[in-house]
């Protein structure tokens, strides 16, 4: 393997991959470990579709697609979707579920850096949801996403802010008290401040268009989008 390919393959945290491999068979269990992803998916999909001016007929790449929850929902909107992930088991689950659902999605096991080297400028929309905090070099992912989108195309990121409140909500609350996600899912040191993400975006051809927070209300047990990016947040960018 040459140096360039080695670098492209290096942006993988194998411990993170193993976490999701272990629970991949339950990816589509609406009451399982991925219940929060199923519950927030309509919000994510709605935000992406609205900000991108619809998805019908567009070529879309979902980076870090896992078992295919978002990828399938975008395909249902009429998009031609490719899903990328480095986890073998999640991709097998995604392929099987798409087959059973009669949904056409192409799933590929490779890094976004590898994909960008072969498919630069080929996508109308690129999504990277809850993935940046699970790789060693998130800035490299941002660069690759910028390379993959067409001029004027849209790139969406979502991740977790790094602060005390985010640690309390996403780690202590979600993992240990409410048990919404498995213990050890998140590492607060890998969370990303909005200013950091915007700084990486500024070093690419992407331009910030909109940012919103994703909020959970434990009293009503509901999620909503709105102002405030102190815990979960989503960023819409557009290629210049």
Swiss-Prot record:
**Is Methyltransferase tagged as a keyword?**
yes
> Which residues are involved in binding S-adenosyl-L-methionine?
44, 64, 85, 129
Q: Give an example GO biological process.
A: methylation
* Keyword tags: Methyltransferase, S-adenosyl-L-methionine, Transferase, Ubiquinone biosynthesis
EC number(s) from the headed UniProt entry = 2.1.1.222, 2.1.1.64
**Known CDD domains for this protein?**
AdoMet_MTases
A Pfam family name for this chain? Methyltransf_23
Q: Which Gene3D superfamilies does UniProt cross-reference here?
A: Vaccinia Virus protein VP39 (3.40.50.150)
Pathway given for this chain reads:
Cofactor biosynthesis; ubiquinone biosynthesis
Catalytic reaction equation(s): a 3-demethylubiquinol + S-adenosyl-L-methionine = a ubiquinol + S-adenosyl-L-homocysteine + H(+); a 3-(all-trans-polyprenyl)benzene-1,2-diol + S-adenosyl-L-methionine = a 2-methoxy-6-(all-trans-polyprenyl)phenol + S-adenosyl-L-homocysteine + H(+)
Q: Which GO terms describe its molecular function?
A: 2-polyprenyl-6-hydroxyphenol methylase activity; 3-demethylubiquinol 3-O-methyltransferase activity; polyprenyldihydroxybenzoate methyltransferase activity
Check the record and name the HAMAP family matching this protein.
Answer: UbiG (MF_00472)
Q: Which family does it belong to?
A: Belongs to the methyltransferase superfamily. UbiG/COQ3 family.
- Tell me the function of this protein: O-methyltransferase that catalyzes the 2 O-methylation steps in the ubiquinone biosynthetic pathway.
Q: What is this protein called?
A: Ubiquinone biosynthesis O-methyltransferase
Q: Which organism is it from?
A: Escherichia coli O7:K1 (strain IAI39 / ExPEC)
**Upper taxonomic lineage:** Bacteria, Pseudomonadati, Pseudomonadota, Gammaproteobacteria, Enterobacterales
